[in-house]
Amino acid sequence: NIEDKTKLHDELEKMFKAADKRYNSGLFSGQHIIFDLNDEVIEKIIEGLYYPQSPYLFNIIEPNMLGKMYEMFLTEELSLADGQIVLQPKKDCKNRSVVTTPDEIVRYMVDKALKVRCSGKSPDEIKKLKVADIACGSGIFLEEAFSKLQACCVDWYLKNDRSHLEAIQGGQYKLPLDEKKEILTNCLYGIDIDVHAVEVAKFSLLIKLIENETAPSVSSSEKILPDLDGNIFYGNSLVDDSMLDGLNVKPQERLEIVPFDWNEMHVEVGFDIILGNPPYVNTSDMHNLLPKVEIDTVYKKKYKTSYKQFDKYYIFIERAISKLKSGGILCYIVPNKFFKIVSGKKLRGLIADAKILRSLDDFGDAQLFADKTIYSSILLLEKSAQKSFIYSSLDNVAALWNASKKDEIEVSEDKINSDPWRLTTDIAFMRLLDKIQQVAKPITDFVDIFNGIQTSAERPEPIYWFTKSEVVDETDSSYVIERNQRRHSIQKQIILERWNI
């Protein structure tokens, strides 16, 4: 309680310095914490955090919700326009590289990846695992991984040494704070090219750390929060300093590229698990967003998967595989187009030749992301030779947790190579496709196709749209439109199904 509002600046600075000694997390560090804010501005900021000006009660909001709030702001930046300071989308968000992953997907992916490595292990073994998200954003995957690692340890103690645990509300148990700190600092790592996202990820993990803690439970800790500077890093996980050595890279370009020194992580033999939702950025957007040297000299020359009109997530998959230890797990949610399109050839070959595909959840044309048209799949790789993988076809997110709604089939690794993957859960149809492949000749033996349908092309109107002015006739079952001096009949049922009418 600061009664004299004219002393807000000085008193808050004292409080922050005391908090820095107590919490030791870097949140309150620095000689000029409040910079040049005056008392009136500080008062407005503080009042804005509490009722009635704020609709939120921050003491009861879930930690992951705080991360989501911050993630919303990560997509915008202050900019000067017509003499006014305005908020506008960052250029990478305009180009779809920032996508918020639904909670159910995050939980499923973390559970799937960690189950492989945590099952049957003791807490001492679990605390040796190294888990990373190399495009971590606000840290939602790392938060969920932190929760899952704790849960695995709690389950082990419940069976083997219940006295080690601390009871909390609802008949539940938790790990002691010091052991949670140990898991956080030993096991979890993240990198992001957005410096603000890095700070949000650190903050979210620290909030997660003190979840279910009380004043008595933290009283024994001299330093309540750990410093996460050795866990969450700012940088470009796709570009090492060594990749730029000998190149004529301008200082400004190097600042934009933000090369990352992987030695800072002190992870000697690779990660046990890498998971997340890497950026989706097509080649044309990369040319608008990134320095030319980064694309032409690093991506195109250092990565095998940078083939033709490649997408950025291709090289994220390649990079992640290279950073796994032998037997390590990679779990990514990515567009499913790479199964089939020409530019995915080298990525398909990389996965198929090494026989590392463990499972593939394919959502077909079901849409999982708000306000984004993305045809998604969940890719699980294990960096050791596999004999077969599980292919699943799903209509929605709920099917992930419901075996009866999940169409799946076991497929031999020998069935896939760098050619487009012909995957279906219909065994008879798969055999038919195999037979056609064996006896038929591809159309490319007869004609040269410059471009097919541009599935991701930018156009003001999709090709299946038409306006009332184009309709020249109508029957009970179809519309007839005229376009480019030709008439086309379109069945009404197709339109009804397309728009779920």
Language model region names:
Residues N1-E104, Y108, K115-R117, L206-L209, ...:
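Non-catalytic, mostly N-terminal accessory regions of nucleic-acid modification and defense proteins
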Residues E3, F28-D36, P52-I60, D92-T101, ...:
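Generic amphipathic alpha-helical segments used as scaffolds and interaction surfaces in large
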Residues K5, H9, D39-E43, P63-L66, ...:
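Alpha-helix initiation and N-capping motif
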Residues E11, M15-A18, K44, G48, ...:
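Residues that form generic nucleotide/phosphate-binding pockets
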Residues V41, V269, K323-K325, V342, ...:
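C-terminal substrate-recognition regions of SAM-dependent nucleic acid methyltransferases
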Residues Y56, Q84-L360, D365, I378, ...:
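SAM-dependent methyltransferase catalytic region
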